[in-house]
């Protein structure tokens, strides 16, 4: 089973690489065509380099615009089917509804270019609308392709606008494909994979609803330990093969951490990580961080830490180096394992800097309690 899932993940990642290569190649051909129209005796090499740089920036701008269009699609179709706005993120820039007000915050998640999270409508007989919300981004990307393709026809081939609109078509089509076709892409499942999981399981629909409700309550300042207990009941092993349902295990272990029930949390995380659960790579990496932290403030065994801190985990922690729980884990390692107070103090300052911009104050409050736990261990 593990090898089968790995093959699926590898195939999905290969497809994403191929799609991005095709987008890059097609954009490159458009760039060459555009530059050829400006070559001549009066154009210097410096001017050609400048034009090339501006065109490359235009490709990046097209990708950014299509991310906005994609997340906007989730927002529009979510609102149309009874969801309410919770947060809207592009790259690390994020708008979040906080106590009824819209706030600007920063959040960076490896493997994601953006994210639109919404508060779900109430469940009715265990059901809720989810297809349009999940596919809304890809639908909007495809609609934009039609719009930009039509606009490109209004300008001559040598025009910058013709170039830019055609790049928008290429990027939009690529995004629609990579998000609409069910794929397990490295750290997270894409929209199509989520929709397929929901179609296959009624239990997954409830799990999806719980995830959205947890996010809604977190944005209102509530901690996991304060939320209804029945939201965090661990699904049976069969249900853990569904990526959305398996995420309830992540929430359940995080709630145990928030309650200070560390031994139970560690035992649950060990079980989840060693089993056949379909927990996405992003959350697996964060869960290993939690186990590292508990080991450091507990027995602090070198052999146990070595087993956790694999090359893959170190790479993950580097990619997620601004995330609060990762910084907290790095702080504990510096303070208690490396015995390096200066390094720990530097990490703590980084934590404070990123915490000030973090969208969920209740999570930062929980993180600070765990930081104090590490400090207390250092004093003993």
Regions flagged by a language model, labelled:
Residues 58-122:
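Small-residue-rich helix-interface/hinge motifs
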Residues 122-219:
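Hydrophobic transmembrane alpha-helical segments that form the core helix bundle
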Residues 80, 115-124, 183-264, 270-276, ...:
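Polar-ligand-bearing catalytic/cofactor-coordination segments
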Residues 48-68, 162-177:
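Membrane-embedded alpha-helical segments that form the functional core of polytopic membrane enzymes
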Residues 226-237, 262-275, 300-316, 340-354, ...:
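Alpha-helical repeat scaffolds
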